[in-house]
Structures are given as C-alpha cells and as structure tokens.
C-alpha cells in the first residue's frame, strides 16, 4: 500500500519580518528556515511522516539545493528514486517572506532551468496525488492505474490543472481556482450563485471540495453542498497549509475514510500546521491531527 505524489519540488528559504516589506531599506532578521518546498513535495513529506510508503515523482537540478532537498525528504521517509536530477540544471527555489503581524506570506519563485521530461514511475501505487506540475507524468500514472483514486491539488487555473481536473477522482481546489474557473469569487452568502458554481466544478470530477482558508471549506456529496468550518486556532504562518491539507486528505483516502471524514482530517492537520512556522517543518504528528479531529469535530452544515 503506497501513495504516489507527482509535482513540483523546490527549495524554500523563509525569512520572517514584522509588518509589510518596505522599499529601499535594509532589514536584519534573526529567523530563517531552509526547507524542501512545492505542493506535491510537502504532501509527500506528510504521508511519509505519517507512516505510508510514499513515492515522489519530480525533477530537481544538479546543485547543492537538490542535495539538501533529497536529504530532508529521506528524513520524512519519502522514496526519492523517481525524483530525477537534471545534469547542469538549477533547482527551483522560492524566497518566502513571512509577515509576522498577520501570519500571511509573500513568495517569490524561481522555477529553475529544468528541462521537461516524462518521469519514471513505481510499479505499484494505491493513491495518486498531483499538483498540476509534471502533467504528462500524472496522466501516465492515471492511465497505468485507472482504478486507483487520484487527488488534484488545484491551486490556480492553468492548462494542466484544467485538464487534470477532468481526469481525477477528487478535485480539491482552492477558492482562487474555483473563483477563476467560475468567473466570480466563491461566496457563502449567495447560495443561488454558489449552486451554479458548484455544479460547474462538479461537472469535471466525481468529488469536489473548495478550500476557503479561515472560512473552512465546502464540498458536494450526494447532490447536496455542505460547509465545514475551519478549526479555531491561532495562526502564526500559513505557508504549506494547503499542501499539508492535501497530503492528509490523500492519507485519509488511502486509509479508506469517507470523503467528509478525509476532509475533516485534512482540516485538522492544516489547522495544526498554521500554529507553527514553515512548510514541511509544520507538519503535525498523525495522532495530533486525529485527536483534534475527534475532540473538536467541526459540524458540517448543509447549504442546499
């Protein structure tokens, strides 16, 4: 039994600053983190930490950052045999500015100089999670194992995420993706419009959920749409919360949880993650997420 995560792999350097980033000054900071980044990579770190045999299919450069990424992933028990090092290439990197006053962040990404290539795949896997990067590899993985449940972390509307949204079992998208695809922002106070928006998303995949940050999430099941509030926590950093959400959701699906229960577990894991700084460094223990889910179970509310 194993999980295959397919997508972006990079190196994050995180600086924490008070307030917004002003122009034309020099700041001295005392907090710095360097970690593997990328939605699929962070999700793989979670499923590996939670004890599932986990494969990551991705690309890195031929540099010191690639070595640091792979070393850290091994600490999370992630199998990196299918992460390809591209000779002479630079790894993807992100400079992340964490705004201490409001727990938000600003990320500046350098995609690296990685050539496109179809990646090798493990011979067997039981759940697929893709973030829209490495499109051809994701399509190949689903074609090879058509009965394996697949999850799309759809953060934004791109050609790749639109194509994959119509192929996967579970479309778990951000409100940015949903709003862009539907042509208008998702609002919980306009049920008529929301009904149409969910129907539009639902036409692409059998299962649909939209994450709404502090407002929780909405999902469709058996013709009804439900709202699941977020767990009440004090947020200090939102970096990686969505990736951790998707990784723990994939874990729940792997473990045979129902769609709503997997979303509850994912919400609990994401809530715990924002109480710490960093992406993979904020992944909670599985027992912590399970306890929060059971002891503070958020009641879903039927919207229509």
Residue ranges and their predicted role:
Residues 1-57, 64-68, 235:
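Glycine-rich phosphate/adenosyl-contacting loop at the front of the ribokinase-like
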Residues 23-27, 34, 49-127, 290-304:
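Conserved N-terminal subdomain of the carbohydrate kinase-like
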Residues 120-121, 164, 171, 201:
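Structural alpha-helical scaffold elements that stabilize or flank donor/cofactor-binding regions
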Residues 9, 133, 244:
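Active-site metal-binding loops of divalent metal-dependent hydrolases
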Residues 184, 188-304:
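Conserved phosphate-binding/catalytic region of the ribokinase-like
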């Amino acid at each position: 039994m194993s999980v295959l995560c397919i997508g972006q792999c990079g190196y994050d350097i995180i600086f924490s600053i008070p307030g917004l980033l002003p122009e034309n000054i020099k700041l001295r900071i005392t907090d710095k983190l360097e970690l593997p980044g990328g939605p699929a990579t962070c999700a793989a770190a979670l499923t590996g930490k939670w004890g599932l045999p986990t494969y990551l299919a991705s690309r890195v450069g031929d540099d010191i950052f690639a070595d640091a990424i792979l070393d850290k992933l091994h600490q999370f028990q992630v199998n990196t045999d299918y992460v390809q090092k591209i000779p002479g290439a630079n790894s993807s990197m992100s400079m992340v500015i964490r705004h201490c006053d409001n727990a938000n962040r600003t990320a500046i990404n350098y995609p690296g100089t990685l050539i496109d290539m179809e990646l090798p795949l493990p011979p067997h896997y039981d759940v697929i999670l893709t973030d829209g990067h490495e499109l051809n590899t994701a399509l190949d993985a689903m074609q090879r194992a058509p009965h394996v449940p697949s999850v799309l972390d759809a953060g934004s509307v791109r050609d790749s995420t639109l194509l994959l949204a119509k192929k996967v079992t579970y479309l778990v998208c951000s409100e940015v993706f949903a709003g862009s695809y539907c042509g208008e922002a998702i609002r919980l106070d306009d049920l008529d419009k929301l009904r149409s928006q969910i129907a539009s998303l639902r036409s692409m995949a059998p299962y649909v959920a939209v994450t709404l940050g502090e407002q929780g999430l909405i999902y469709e099941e058996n013709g009804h749409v439900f709202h699941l509030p977020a767990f009440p926590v004090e947020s200090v950093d939102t970096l990686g919360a969505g990736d951790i959400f998707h990784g723990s959701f994939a874990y729940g699906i792997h473990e045979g949880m129902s769609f709503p229960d997997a979303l509850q577990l994912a919400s609990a894991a994401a809530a715990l993650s924002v109480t710490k700084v960093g992406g993979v460094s904020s992944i909670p223990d599985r027992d912590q997420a399970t306890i929060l889910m059971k002891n503070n179970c958020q009641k879903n509310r039927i919207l229509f």
